[in-house]
């Protein structure tokens, strides 16, 4: 009888791709994959440790699933990813329930590693220098719906922002070759994928370390040639890497969603300098103005950090006013997390947790109002929407996402009239909206 494996993946989509590679390797090695942890002989927790909240979620999940070794059939608990890569010594002591720790360099060896545990009583650790990069020859068992997929175009990061632990956990930038990416993309489309979301720590850095230094716009142009692919979405595009050529291909290529995720993190120059960000306030303002002028219909998402060391009330007011002025369509806000080993952790003028939370609430309150306002502008317009199934609230409504909404992080569209199948891309007339969601009816073609 095949042993059953269950996987819980935490954190970002980049982590999800790593989890899918491990599942693919295990399925190829004759393990049976199950989504029910109670049925699993082996449970794997793929962790995140980017910020404090992510670490807490990872630890809580590990402790919860450790109970399956007592009240379920679980024989092995395996913890993979960023948390063991960063805290291997501490975790080995504090989590004796865990049988195997695997860092970010050994995902393709997961089946071999589990086999090495047979007959070995002591806890095992496999933590190597982070040099892994996904290759299209590795199996990948996609866990997301067939119609959508993430395409991880690079691993690691060489930006060295002062608050970030990613370079120490994932290593320096390592881009996947163009032909490698195109091969995987074609395979995804051949198995039903209609939307590909490009991801990396910084997608604009893709190609800098490859022979000939190919650019992101070259990659997008080649992806757009794939027959059957309908949407290409760009996530995690650092502002200093966005070129006129990239703006032009978003503007002119029909398959590229009029959507761009640009994590600016702040707008005040003193804060940006302490963050070791390469963009300045004038440069960010000019970039956003240029994008909006060239592509008026584009949906812009950004990420911001509040409470960074030394952030004054004046810095925060500058940020708040900029958000009100710019009116981003989507906004993610994070309270600064003091991460040991980063330059920012040792900075003076650390901001209190109370002030961080207060600034977070103020910013999100403003964004809710702005998002509602921008959504109202879409009423009586038509949008392309990918159908994702029935609404969570009622099976009388279908739900989906427009090309202006990324999976998992943005709002949804609720479909009140018309028929469609999951994965269909339909035209929808927007009839109403809320702070973050849209409501509409399918337009018969």
Curated annotation (Swiss-Prot):
Family annotation (SUPFAM superfamilies)? Radical SAM enzymes
Q: Where is the MTTase N-terminal domain?
A: 3-119
Q: Does the keyword S-adenosyl-L-methionine apply?
A: yes
Reactions performed catalytically? L-aspartate(89)-[ribosomal protein uS12]-hydrogen + (sulfur carrier)-SH + AH2 + 2 S-adenosyl-L-methionine = 3-methylsulfanyl-L-aspartate(89)-[ribosomal protein uS12]-hydrogen + (sulfur carrier)-H + 5'-deoxyadenosine + L-methionine + A + S-adenosyl-L-homocysteine + 2 H(+)
Q: Which domain of life is it from?
A: Bacteria
The cofactor note from the UniProt entry for this protein is: Binds 2 [4Fe-4S] clusters. One cluster is coordinated with 3 cysteines and an exchangeable S-adenosyl-L-methionine.
Cellular localisation: Cytoplasm
Report residues binding [4Fe-4S] cluster 2. Answer: 157, 161, 164
Give the chief site where it resides.
cytoplasm
Give the matching Pfam families: Radical_SAM, TRAM_2, UPF0004
TRAM domain sequence ranges: 376-444
Where does the Radical SAM core domain start and stop, copy by copy?
A: 143-373
Top EC group: transferase
Q: Which cysteines are joined by disulfide bonds?
A: none
Q: Its Enzyme Commission number?
A: 2.8.4.4
Cofactor list:
[4Fe-4S] cluster
Q: Which GO terms describe its biological process?
A: tRNA modification
Q: Which family does it belong to?
A: Belongs to the methylthiotransferase family. RimO subfamily.
Q: What does this protein do?
A: Catalyzes the methylthiolation of an aspartic acid residue of ribosomal protein uS12.
Q: By what name is this protein known?
A: Ribosomal protein uS12 methylthiotransferase RimO
Where is the organism placed in the taxonomic lineage, from the top? Bacteria, Pseudomonadati, Thermodesulfobacteriota, Desulfuromonadia, Geobacterales
């Amino acid at each position: 009888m095949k042993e059953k494996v269950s996987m819980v993946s935490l954190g970002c989509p980049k982590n999800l791709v790593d989890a899918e590679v491990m599942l693919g390797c295990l399925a190829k090695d004759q393990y049976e994959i199950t989504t029910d942890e109670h049925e699993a002989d082996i449970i794997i927790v793929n962790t995140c440790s980017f910020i404090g909240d992510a670490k807490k979620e990872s630890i809580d999940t590990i402790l919860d699933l450790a109970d399956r070794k007592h009240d379920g059939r679980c024989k092995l608990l395996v913890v993979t990813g960023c948390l063991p890569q960063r805290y291997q010594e501490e975790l080995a002591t504090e989590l004796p329930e865990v049988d195997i720790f695997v860092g970010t360099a050994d995902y393709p060896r997961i089946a071999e590693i589990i086999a090495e545990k047979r007959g070995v009583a002591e806890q095992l650790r496999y933590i190597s220098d982070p040099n892994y990069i996904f290759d299209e020859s590795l199996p990948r068992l996609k866990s997301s719906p067939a119609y959508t997929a993430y395409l991880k175009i690079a691993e690691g990061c060489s930006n060295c922002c002062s608050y970030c632990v990613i370079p120490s956990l994932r290593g320096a930038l390592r881009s996947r070759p163009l032909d490698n990416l195109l091969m995987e993309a074609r395979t995804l489309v051949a198995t039903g994928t209609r939307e590909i979301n490009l991801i990396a720590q910084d997608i604009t850095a893709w190609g800098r370390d490859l022979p000939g230094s190919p650019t992101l716009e070259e990659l997008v142009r080649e992806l757009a040639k794939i027959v059957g692919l309908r949407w290409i979405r760009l996530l995690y595009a650092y502002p200093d890497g966005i070129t006129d050529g990239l703006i032009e291909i978003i503007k002119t290529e029909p398959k590229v969603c009029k959507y761009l995720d640009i994590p600016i993190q702040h707008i005040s120059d003193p804060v940006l300098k302490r963050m070791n960000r390469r963009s300045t306030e004038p440069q960010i303002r000019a970039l956003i103005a240029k994008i909006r002028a060239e592509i008026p219909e584009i949906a812009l998402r950004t990420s911001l950090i509040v409470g960074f060391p030394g952030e004054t009330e004046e810095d925060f007011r500058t940020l708040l006013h900029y958000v009100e002025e710019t009116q981003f369509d989507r906004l993610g806000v994070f309270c600064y997390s003091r991460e040991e080993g980063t330059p920012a952790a040792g900075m003076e003028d650390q901001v209190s947790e109370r002030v961080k939370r207060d600034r977070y609430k103020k910013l999100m309150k403003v964004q809710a109002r702005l998002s509602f306002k921008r959504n109202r502008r879409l009423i009586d317009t038509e949008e392309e929407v990918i159908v994702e199934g029935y609404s969570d609230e009622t099976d009388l409504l279908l739900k989906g996402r427009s090309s202006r909404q990324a999976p998992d992080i943005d709002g949804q569209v609720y479909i009140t009239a018309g028929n469609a199948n999951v994965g269909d891309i339909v035209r929808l007339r927007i009839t109403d909206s809320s702070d973050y969601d849209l409501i509409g009816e399918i337009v018969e073609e």
